[in-house]
UniProtKB/Swiss-Prot annotation:
It is found in: Cytoplasm. This is Proline/serine-rich protein C17A5.10. Residues 31-52 have a biased composition (Low complexity). Belongs to the HUA1 family. GO terms for cellular component: cytoplasm. May be involved in assembly and disassembly of the actin cytoskeleton. It comes from the Eukaryota. Residues 1-10 have a biased composition (Pro residues). Keywords: Cytoplasm. InterPro entries: Hua1-like. Residues 1-110 are annotated as: Disordered. Its main location: cytoplasm.
Length: 224
């Protein structure tokens, strides 16, 4: 036969020839001594398995760890700032500045008993040059704006009293006769006193319209 007809050797035969594993006869004679398990001798293990077990790194420090641990990086130096505080006398550290002769630190004592009372409104006489308005006030009535004087504290006529107690002229709206004197409402030449409702203008101005004063009927004055 030629060499091509011979089958190639198997993987186990190659290992036996190289001495990696033992033959079946030698392996059958060895039995385990503990509970039927194979012996833990390294002679029955393959050479590559034994070499892999023996090649495990052992810690050089002798702490018993199977694997060596990487050493920790060195600690970084911490920059320490110089301490500017110097132990000394506390009175010198927190001493107040010396008083200056130009600065007056004395303050007048606060008077807690002092209080500001609102001045009470008094019945002021009517402004000079204006006659006192005498409305027909009912008994016991007191106006809080003018105090029954007809004029407020600002000197302007009281519209509240004029609307409630004022009388008006009998006005007829027509063309004036020839030669009549034409004056504006509230003119000083018109007899009477100034109307407190319209303040002598004879009309009331609203946001969108203007109407004639209902107290003085547009004259600007009311009779005494």
């Amino acid at each position: 036969m030629t060499d091509d007809s011979v089958p190639p050797p198997s993987y186990e035969e190659v290992l036996r020839q190289e001495g990696v594993i033992d033959s079946p006869n030698s392996s059958n004679g060895q039995t385990s001594t503990s509970a039927g398990h194979p012996s833990s001798s390294s002679s029955t293990l393959p050479n590559y398995a034994a070499s892999s077990l023996n090649s495990r790194p052992v810690s050089s420090s002798g702490s018993g760890n199977a694997y060596s641990q990487a050493p920790y990086p060195p600690a970084r130096p911490t920059s320490q700032r110089p301490n500017s505080w110097q132990p000394g006398n506390a009175s010198t550290m927190y001493a107040s500045p010396p008083p200056s002769s130009n600065y007056n630190t004395a303050k007048p004592p606060y008077q807690t008993s002092q209080f500001y009372a609102r001045p009470q409104s008094s019945y002021a006489p009517p402004p000079s040059g204006r006659p006192r308005i005498s409305y027909p006030y009912p008994p016991g009535y007191m106006c809080y704006k003018c105090h029954n004087t007809g004029y407020k504290d600002s000197g302007r006529p009281c519209g509240r009293c004029a609307r409630r107690f004022g009388r008006s002229y009998d006005v007829q709206f027509s063309r004036p006769p020839p030669g009549a004197l034409v004056v504006y409402p509230g003119d000083p030449r018109i007899p009477g006193r100034v109307c407190g409702n319209c303040k002598g203008s004879g009309q009331l101005d609203f946001i969108f319209f203007t109407e004639i004063c209902p107290v003085c009927n547009g004259v600007g004055k009311i009779p005494y």
